Amino acid sequence: MNIIPCSIKTLKGLYDISGVEVGQHFYWQIGGFQIHAQVLITSWVVITILLGSVIIAVRNPQTIPTDGQNFFEYVLEFIRDLSKTQIGEEYGPWVPFIGTMFLFIFVSNWSGALLPWKIIQLPHGELAAPTNDINTTVALALLTSAAYFYAGLSKKGLSYFEKYIKPTPILLPINILEDFTKPLSLSFRLFGNILADELVVVVLVSLVPLVVPIPVMFLGLFTSGIQALIFATLAAAYIGESMEGHH
């Protein structure tokens, strides 16, 4: 007779132990505006890591690169090749944008698994990777949308909008809808993957010994890197598409 109440108590106990909080946020009031503090704090940490790493690695460049300098030169070459492949010969001005997107998302994703965010206690919610928040991923997707609109308009002028009625005006609604679905797919793909990965690891750590979730954490690091690469590749592809005018 007491099986159901005991089961409910057991499940409630496991939920309390897990400490998974979804939708809990900590806000700052600045100048009458409500600011999402969790995202700002973790984003500042990620930006500091990126800037600090670059400064340390290249503050004294050598003719024969050191390990740190060699690593960053390899990363730059990788981003340059990615941009050239997706955008074409006019890729040069877009390397900083694609590189910034890739590195910020990559370090943000990895920070969710490697940095002990829970050490910092907040009145509400808890810190996590910046890309674990839909606000961040939507902002990145909107920046990408603005970038490919700018790329198309700067090269073609107002004739850029002719693409909406090609190859036939009947496709006008579909072509317009496509520009709305691009940022949606970019933002929700990144947000969903990172959130799911962190929740799985947190739940496993709370329910089983520490050794068991380690393979899942390594898998999460791999998929996090892949998500950063996918986002940067799609951003570059959209920019290249807007400049070339093909689908």
From Swiss-Prot:
InterPro entries: ATP_syn_F0_a_bact/chloroplast (IPR045082), ATP_synth_F0_asu (IPR000568), ATP_synth_F0_asu_AS (IPR023011), F0_ATP_A_sf (IPR035908)
Keyword Thylakoid tagged: yes
Membrane spanning stretches: 38-58, 95-115, 134-154, 199-219, 220-240
Localization: Plastid, Chloroplast thylakoid membrane
GO cellular component, one term: plastid
Keywords recorded for this protein, A-Z: ATP synthesis, CF(0), Chloroplast, Hydrogen ion transport, Ion transport, Membrane, Plastid, Thylakoid, Transmembrane, Transmembrane helix, Transport
GO molecular function: proton-transporting ATP synthase activity, rotational mechanism
Its membrane topology: Multi-pass membrane protein
Superkingdom of origin organism: Eukaryota
Main location: plastid
Family: Belongs to the ATPase A chain family.
NCBIfam families: ATP_synt_6_or_A
Subunit architecture: F-type ATPases have 2 components, CF(1) - the catalytic core - and CF(0) - the membrane proton channel. CF(1) has five subunits: alpha(3), beta(3), gamma(1), delta(1), epsilon(1). CF(0) has four main subunits: a, b, b' and c.
Described function: Key component of the proton channel; it plays a direct role in the translocation of protons across the membrane.
Protein name: ATP synthase subunit a, chloroplastic
Highest classification ranks of the organism: Eukaryota, Viridiplantae, Streptophyta, Embryophyta, Tracheophyta
GN (gene name): atpI
